[in-house]
Amino acid sequence: MIWLTLVFASLLSVAGQLCQKQATCFVAINKRRKHIVLWLGLALACLGLAMVLWLLVLQNVPVGIAYPMLSLNFVWVTLAAVKLWHEPVSPRHWCGVAFIIGGIVILGSTV
């Protein structure tokens, strides 16, 4: 159950980062303020809940194991950036993502 909490904390943290990115996207001048307030408000909510879940994780998992698992954030953000904003990702970046996943598997298997 705690590992599910860790994954959910990671996903909420990523959602907060993505909301911040969305807040910076161009909108018509007459809708800009509402757009920014909406997306930054969602970012704060996601990041706040992620922090609470992260504290629960830290109560149950050694920080040396838990913290590297947040490297998943780099994977989630890359996938979301490609899907949501069609951002280009270089082969070198994908190689880095593969190394991150490999590292998470290695660290996760020690538990």
UniProtKB/Swiss-Prot annotation:
Superkingdom per UniProt: Bacteria
Entry's localization field: Cell inner membrane
Keywords, comma-separated and alphabetical: Cell inner membrane, Cell membrane, Lipid A biosynthesis, Lipid biosynthesis, Lipid metabolism, Lipopolysaccharide biosynthesis, Membrane, Transmembrane, Transmembrane helix, Transport
EamA domain mapped to chain residues: 40-109
Disulphide bond pairs: none
UniProt note: phenotype after gene disruption: Cells lacking this gene lack L-Ara4N-modified lipid A and are sensitive to polymyxin.
HAMAP family listed in its UniProt record: Flippase_ArnE
Function: Translocates 4-amino-4-deoxy-L-arabinose-phosphoundecaprenol (alpha-L-Ara4N-phosphoundecaprenol) from the cytoplasmic to the periplasmic side of the inner membrane.
Family per record: Belongs to the ArnE family.
Protein name as it appears in the record: Probable 4-amino-4-deoxy-L-arabinose-phosphoundecaprenol flippase subunit ArnE
